[in-house]
Amino acid sequence: MSFELDIGHTSQAGRNEVNEDFAALVQGQGRDRERGAIAAIADGVSTGGKGREAAQTTVNTLVNDYFATPDTWDTTVALDRILSAHNGWLASMNRRRQPAVGLTTLTAVVLRGQSYTLAHVGDTRAYLLRGGRLQLLTTDHVMAQRDLAHQLTRAMGLDDHVVVDYSQGELHSGDLLVLLSDGVHGSLPERELRQLLLQPQDANTPSAVGAQALSEEITRAALRRGSTDNVTALVVRVQGALEATLQDESRRAQHLPVLPLLKVGEPVDGLVVTALVADSGVHRIYQVRDPATQRLYALKTLVPARAHDAQERATLAHEAWVARRMQSGHAAVSYTHLRAHETSLH
């Protein structure tokens, strides 16, 4: 299935003279296509008019530099390296320019392979709509006291070191990801947001509203609700997913159960064990047979005692990922049909 996105972006100053929100999305092209896409939204906070600059430079730096990081880096590592460096630069600029200070929130999501990776600082938000259920993916970094409800506890450029919230999850075709500034989510109840996202295009068209139309309607609804801040919405509908990446496989391997010690004749995900070939104390290799074709295969597993070893799980996933990509008459070929029935780690 090809990786296709329907993208919508609307940003307005609202009742303010200056719009200090900024958002962008970049999708990999050519050799970078396998890197997926990155979307980000930022809400600048300033004294002296530097909020817009902070928001714009933070988003542009992240979405452009992401594709320059090594492909072998985990997505969270790539994002953290970029954000740490940019935060240090922004904090240094703020010290030199005081009292004119520019801070910004940031919520960014990378859509890669069959997963998403989220990075978050401040009170911009990310939502995921899947199967009719709207889920908030971020936590607002604001003071708990009622009279200081809008005072940020974390922001890009506030200190030399920034603590970024990272999270990852599976990406499904049909998912709708929505990034919002606080000018939107502070006025628009989640119940109403969900209703907007679920609305059909019209009575005669069962297909969903396009992402651009959704982003426009979300910001209009926030203004109708009395928002006095800038309003920005970035909407991304996933219309297809890429092939699983090594990162996807490694994350998946951490959750699959490890097989018990198997005996000859026992079934394993549609195969039948015919012999124990090797036992290293860490791994076991079994000979297994496909009853449908009578073909024999080798099946490698972790011993139960190493079930909690995250590194061994990741290594086994790495070996399987490499094997599926090797096309050689001199190397073992992965039995890809088994993946459709895989319920355990092997």
Regions found by a protein language model. Give the residues of each.
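Conserved HxN/HPN-centered segment at the entrance to the catalytic loop
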Residues: 327-335
